[in-house]
A protein has these predicted regions:
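Active-site helix of classical SDR
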Residues: 14, 56, 64
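Active-site Tyr-X3-Lys motif and surrounding loop/helix of classical short-chain dehydrogenase/reductase
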Residues: 1-4
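Residue(s) in the substrate-gating loop at a strand-loop-helix junction
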Residues: 40
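A conserved structural motif in NAD(P)-dependent oxidoreductases
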Residues: 107-118
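Short C-terminal tail/terminal secondary-structure segment
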Residues: 45, 123, 134-149
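Short, small/polar-rich loop/turn modules that mediate ligand/substrate recognition or access, typified
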Residues: 72, 77, 133-135
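Alpha-helical segment proximal to the catalytic Tyr-Lys
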Residues: 19, 69-70, 131
Length: 149
């Protein structure tokens, strides 16, 4: 069920969107459209009790790269937004755990991410500002992805 919702659904929707975009003329901004997928820090952060979720999000990351490579010559950039700990209903039941992690500095920006943070990342990628980019992953995780010792 998790794989169907989190991986197959976005893959099939992206394929439908790409087919539609391919039928369109290239716009003045040089694109036919943009495909943006939402993954999670779980794409590359192991959580044994959420293995299927992690696999599905890692799959989204690979899907983004495959589609980016396939669609680059057709003027359709493809991007991934990878949120960290975002304050939503999904994270409410583990709020105390994440509050402690934030306090301990696991997330360098030391705050919860907000849905508006993710929306701003999507808006940036959809804006057409990044005219020579595709296949990129935009981390919206308060610096969590930065490797540290």
């Amino acid at each position: 069920r998790v794989m169907n919702i989190n991986l197959k659904g976005p893959l099939f929707l992206s394929q439908i969107a790409a087919r539609q975009m391919l039928r369109q003329a290239v716009r003045p901004d040089g694109r036919r459209g943009t495909i943006i997928s939402i993954s999670s820090i779980s794409a590359d952060t192991v959580s044994l009790n959420r293995a299927e979720y992690c696999l599905s999000k890692a799959g989204i990351s690979m899907m983004t790269q495959i589609l980016a490579l396939r669609l680059a010559q057709d003027a359709i950039p493809v991007f991934e937004v990878r949120p960290g700990i975002i304050k939503t209903d999904m994270t409410a039941r583990v709020q105390d755990t994440y509050d402690r992690m934030i306090e301990q500095g696991v997330f360098p920006m030391r705050r919860w991410g907000q849905p508006d943070d993710v929306a701003a990342a999507v808006a940036l990628l959809a804006s057409g500002t990044l005219t020579y980019a595709t296949g990129e992953c935009l981390h919206v995780d308060g610096g969590f992805h930065i490797r540290r010792l």
